């Protein structure tokens, strides 16, 4: 059963805070294991990655070259799709590409009053690695959401890793990689794949940034290699917060909550409303849906451990709670959803109106589904083209324009006791 809370309860603040508390990577033994894997991959390269892939994934590969897929294999997988699946995948890819094209940043410059040129140069990263969760239940949508923004950014080389338990792969993942323009694919996973991308091996080139979700070993490895390479984020369990008032279909709302609860036993689904009757209806609809849901066991554990039905006194109180949660996915199911969204400061993605289920955003709306979790929407953003670009400042002083700037730099450098700085500037105006 999903717990029911009311903001009028005396213990609500503490209970709600406890509900939100979750440590993504905080197991000393896990961190020790991951550190050892990374060290071994750095020392032994291909040999150790192959060994761990055979051990953990039971992959039948005899040599490292068996772990790399060819472009011909990707093309074959794409061409083997049924017309219906191919059209859906192409629609999703087209919409994702179109949305992310609007994010692409360009350089700029201007000449100041002193005649100096100042600006910013935008450059794509040279090479990126994308991690895609593997197995027969893997997600082609993750391929599109990670690879397409990199492609739009102008990244010339995209390396993808995806584990293949028992050597088996979801052909739709390969088709998505073909459609998204992935350069090379290796059927490896876990901390060893992250280490290989970060430091390189005899076969896998080192990348500049690693993106994509994975299990706790992957999350720990990404945290460990950060600094050697960039990363997108440390992904926690999936989250959804649904706020509803007025006329709503309780069955729709309940299924929206379960759409995230079915991901993982530690996923989080929270429903907030000022309408107690609607709260009752949603609670009942959840139980009815669970009776027929294939992943009911996972969803039931998720909502029992980390889910909640929350009764608030009004919309303003709900907004306070939403900003406290900073949810990965936020649905606003009411007539004034756009107006309410203006008061939301912290959320990964905001789905406005009764006809906008979170699932649309997962696949084909266009915006990225790689979103900040565990409250990190307070300070971070969805994955985007900007994650695959970097900026360099441009400064060019004219012979006359440098004089006043150099005098100021000279004075400030002296105050910081940096004599070489001061003299360097002074040479330009004396």
From Swiss-Prot:
Catalytic activity from the UniProt record: L-histidinol + 2 NAD(+) + H2O = L-histidine + 2 NADH + 3 H(+)
Top-level EC class: oxidoreductase
Pathway(s) where this gene product acts: Amino-acid biosynthesis; L-histidine biosynthesis; L-histidine from 5-phospho-alpha-D-ribose 1-diphosphate: step 9/9
Binding site for substrate: 238, 260, 263, 329, 362, 416, 421
Pfam family, one: Histidinol_dh
EC number: 1.1.1.23
Entry-linked SUPFAM superfamilies: ALDH-like
Positions contributing to Zn(2+) binding: 260, 263, 362, 421
Single Gene Ontology BP annotation: L-histidine biosynthetic process
Free-text remark on how the cofactor is bound: Binds 1 zinc ion per subunit.
Molecular function via GO: histidinol dehydrogenase activity; NAD binding; zinc ion binding
Family, as annotated: Belongs to the histidinol dehydrogenase family.
Alphabetical list of NCBIfam families matching this protein: hisD
Protein's name according to its UniProt entry: Histidinol dehydrogenase
Species annotation: Acinetobacter baylyi (strain ATCC 33305 / BD413 / ADP1)
Lineage: Bacteria, Pseudomonadati, Pseudomonadota, Gammaproteobacteria, Moraxellales
Gene: hisD
């Amino acid at each position: 059963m999903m717990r029911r809370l009311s903001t009028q309860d005396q213990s609500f603040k503490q209970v709600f805070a406890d509900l939100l508390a979750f440590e993504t990577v905080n197991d000393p033994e896990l961190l020790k294991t991951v550190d050892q894997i990374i060290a071994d991959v750095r020392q032994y390269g291909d040999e150790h990655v192959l060994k761990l892939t055979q051990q953990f994934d039971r992959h039948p590969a005899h040599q490292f070259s068996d772990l790399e897929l060819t472009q011909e294999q990707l093309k074959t997988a794409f061409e083997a799709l049924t017309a219906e699946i191919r059209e859906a995948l192409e629609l999703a890819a087209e919409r994702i590409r179109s949305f992310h094209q609007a994010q692409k940043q360009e350089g700029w410059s201007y000449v100041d009053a002193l005649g100096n040129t100042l600006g910013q140069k935008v450059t794509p990263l040279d090479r990126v690695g994308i991690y895609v969760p593997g197995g027969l239940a893997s997600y082609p949508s993750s391929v599109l959401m990670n690879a397409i923004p990199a492609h739009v950014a102008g990244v010339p080389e995209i390396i993808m890793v995806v584990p293949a338990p028992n050597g088996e792969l979801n052909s739709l993942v390969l088709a998505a990689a073909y459609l998204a323009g992935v350069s090379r694919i290796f059927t490896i996973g876990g901390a060893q794949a992250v280490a290989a991308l970060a430091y390189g091996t005899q076969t896998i080139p080192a990348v500049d940034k690693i993106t994509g979700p994975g299990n706790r070993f992957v999350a720990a490895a990404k945290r460990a290699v950060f600094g050697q390479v960039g990363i997108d984020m440390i992904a926690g369990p999936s989250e959804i917060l649904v706020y509803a008032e007025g006329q709503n279909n309780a069955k729709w709302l309940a299924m929206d909550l379960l759409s995230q609860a079915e991901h993982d036993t530690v996923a989080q689904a929270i429903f907030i409303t000022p309408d107690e009757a609607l709260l009752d209806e949603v609670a009942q609809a959840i139980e009815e849906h669970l009776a027929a849901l294939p992943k009911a066991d996972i969803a039931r554990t998720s909502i029992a451990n980390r889910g909640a039905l929350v009764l608030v006194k009004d919309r303003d109180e709900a907004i306070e709670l939403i900003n406290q949660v900073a949810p990965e996915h936020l649905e606003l199911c009411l007539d004034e959803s756009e107006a309410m969204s203006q008061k939301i400061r912290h959320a990964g993605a905001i789905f406005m109106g009764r006809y906008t289920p979170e699932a649309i955003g997962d696949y084909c709306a266009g915006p990225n589904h790689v979103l900040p979790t565990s409250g990190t929407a307070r300070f971070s953003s969805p994955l985007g083209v900007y994650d695959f670009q970097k900026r360099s400042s441009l400064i060019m002083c004219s012979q006359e324009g440098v004089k006043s700037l150099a005098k100021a730099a000279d004075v400030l450098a002296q105050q910081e006791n940096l004599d070489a700085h001061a003299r360097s500037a002074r040479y330009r105006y004396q």
